């Protein structure tokens, strides 16, 4: 992947139809090594220089390092995955991800910089109902999805969280978050 900026620079002129580039819906673009290699930053610079729309999704407050590019680009938006308001729950399901408070703070800083922001509450974890108050005024939109990974059901059972797998939990929490 170290040649990603070079490939992007070469491929963009070949594209006749513009579509938003999702950076990155599958693999976090701000993993710890990004601090050293700066590949995401280079790719964002290339996209911005070519007026190419981009949607950035991460769990990492490292996205703030690139706030200048994101803010000044013509059509960029940035979002953070925030699956619960409860950091103890985060530790069970996302033990290596940044704390919830840091992600909320990053959303706030991005939003105050005039950047379109969103929260990705997917998968919705126990404690997500507390996100409404934490996210209010910090996002322009929200994406919500339930826990669809049945291989994770054992974690719910082990810690007595089965109620959060129920349809009622999803619909009740979705309604609370929809008010944003």
What are these regions (language model features)?
Residues 46-52, 105-117, 171-180:
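A structural motif corresponding to the C-terminal end of an alpha-helix
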Residues 37-40, 73-82, 128-143:
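Short, electropositive alpha-helical surface patch
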Residues 96, 106-129:
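Conserved strand-turn element in the central/C-terminal portion of the radical SAM core barrel
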Residues 125-180:
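Auxiliary Fe-S-binding modules of radical SAM enzymes
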Residues 35-38, 94-102, 161-169:
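Alpha-helix N-cap and loop-to-helix initiation/capping positions
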Residues 1-77, 84-88, 100, 112:
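Conserved Radical SAM active-site core
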Residues 21, 54, 78-80, 117-119, ...:
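Hydrophobic faces of well-ordered beta-strands that scaffold small-molecule active sites
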Residues 7-8, 39-43, 66, 102-106, ...:
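A general structural detector for well-ordered alpha-helical segments in enzyme core domains, enriched
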